């Protein structure tokens, strides 16, 4: 039964101990390193000899491996043989209509698309997904989670979810559907303002976005543009560059910087120019991650866009699969993404230019207070005010989402 947690808690505790032991050992030369490794050995021996139930050594070691790598960031993981299949390949066409981010080793829903299967099933931001297709989500990286919740159109997606409002477990089954948009939506929440909401940055085609923006500008004039990147997560920084191009940027975009070896440069492609308003703003929070953070950083540097809302998640490196000699793989971030000017958001995220204060929202039924605050600020002329600093968790709404750094 999935309700039985004692062995998994034991593995998690041991994973924490070995993670701390190995990390501390790596930071101390010579004899001092053994002091930290001895902690692991002592816990290992005490567990094997005294735990009330029989303990599988293989399970303990695998839990330690998973905990150690998962503690690095939201895109790194230890993968047992077979788990690597398709993990870095493009997601399937079917979608349930929600986005996940790992937070404190738990998968948290950070966006639910209106009219989607997820919305019809009553899922909300802040809900925790405990199991996907019978598999626990604990210690899963974002690429693994993305792969698990996408697939062929019409496929069933079985979930065990902790309702973030009522704190009760739900078992539900969704049918994956073809997305109704191209990874973005355009609307006008206030007169004279165009909001571009990026839902899936890794699905956006730059040329299609440029055509849609051009048509919107031809329909009615606008004095400002708000790019809404909340709940947007991805790892394709080339797509981020294409989105920036659709908004009028061009030239150097990003650099992929490995720990050693040559860098790779990613330029923003040239697209036909669009006469967009000069007043540009980007709405972000702690659910803005990966390629969405790359886009926000580029728009601030290249187009003088002002970031508002809450500080971002801090997923600023790209993973690759590294085979292990005895089987399995490491999914490990090996290249940090920085802008042409050297801006990085790995671990700490991007600090906003204007932090927006809102009332505490209980959920989607209470509207969108952060968007309302952004619209009011823009309507007031976007007055200057230094950001008040990062939040206690370094993140924004929904509550409970934090970076894995």
Residue ranges and their predicted role:
Residues 8-25:
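Hydrophobic membrane-insertion alpha-helices, especially the h-region
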Residues 91-131, 135-139, 203-206, 335-336:
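PDZ/PDZ-like domain segments forming the peptide/carboxylate-binding groove
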Residues 49-108, 143, 154-158, 162-186, ...:
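Extended, small/polar residue-biased N-terminal targeting/export presequences
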Residues 129-130, 157, 330, 345:
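Generic structural signal for buried aliphatic residues
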Residues 1-5:
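Short, Lys/Arg-rich N-terminal segment immediately upstream of the first membrane anchor
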Residues 36-48:
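Mature N-terminal segment immediately following signal peptide/propeptide cleavage
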Residues 363-387, 392-394:
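Low-complexity, Gly/Ser/Thr/Pro-rich intrinsically disordered linker/tail segments
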Residues 26-27, 31-36, 56, 110, ...:
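Cleft-lining beta-strand/loop regions that shape enzyme active-site pockets
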């Amino acid at each position: 039964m999935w309700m039985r947690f004692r062995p998994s808690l034991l593995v998690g505790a041991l994973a924490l101990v070995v993670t701390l032991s190995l990390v501390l050992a790596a930071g101390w030369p010579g004899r001092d390193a053994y002091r930290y490794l001895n902690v692991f050995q002592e816990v290992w021996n005490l567990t094997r000899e005294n735990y009330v139930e029989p303990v599988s050594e293989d399970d303990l070691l695998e839990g330690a491996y998973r905990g150690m790598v998962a503690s690095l960031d939201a895109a790194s993981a230890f993968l047992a043989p077979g788990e690597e299949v398709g993990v870095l390949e493009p997601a399937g066409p079917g979608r349930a209509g929600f986005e996940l981010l790992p937070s404190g080793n738990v998968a948290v829903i950070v966006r639910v698309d209106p009219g989607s299967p997820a919305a019809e099933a009553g899922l909300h931001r802040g809900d925790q997904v405990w199991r996907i297709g019978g598999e626990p989500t604990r210690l899963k990286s974002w690429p693994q989670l993305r792969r698990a919740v996408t697939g062929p159109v019409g496929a069933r997606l079985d979930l065990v979810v902790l309702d973030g409002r009522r704190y009760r477990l739900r078992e539900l089954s969704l049918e994956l559907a073809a997305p109704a948009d191209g990874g973005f939506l355009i609307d006008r929440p206030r007169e004279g303002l165009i909001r571009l909401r990026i839902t899936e940055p890794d699905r956006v085609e730059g040329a299609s976005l440029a055509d849609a923006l051009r048509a919107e500008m031809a329909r009615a004039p606008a004095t400002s543009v708000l790019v809404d990147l909340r709940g947007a997560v991805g790892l394709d920084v080339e797509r981020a560059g294409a989105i920036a191009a659709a908004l009028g940027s061009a030239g150097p975009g990003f650099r992929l910087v490995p720990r050693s070896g040559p860098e790779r440069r990613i330029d923003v492609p040239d697209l036909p120019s669009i006469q967009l308003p000069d007043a540009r703003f980007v709405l972000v929070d702690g659910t803005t991650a990966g390629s969405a953070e790359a886009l926000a950083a580029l728009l601030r540097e290249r187009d003088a866009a002002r970031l508002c809302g809450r500080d971002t998640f801090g997923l600023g490196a790209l993973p690759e699969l590294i085979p292990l000699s005895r089987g399995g793989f490491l999914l490990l971030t090996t290249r940090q993404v920085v802008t042409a000017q050297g801006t990085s958001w790995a671990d700490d995220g991007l600090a906003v230019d204007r932090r927006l204060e809102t009332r505490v929202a209980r959920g989607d039924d209470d509207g969108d207070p952060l968007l309302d605050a952004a619209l009011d600020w823009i309507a007031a002329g976007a007055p200057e005010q230094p950001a008040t600093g990062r939040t206690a968790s370094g993140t924004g709404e929904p509550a409970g989402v934090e970076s894995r750094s």
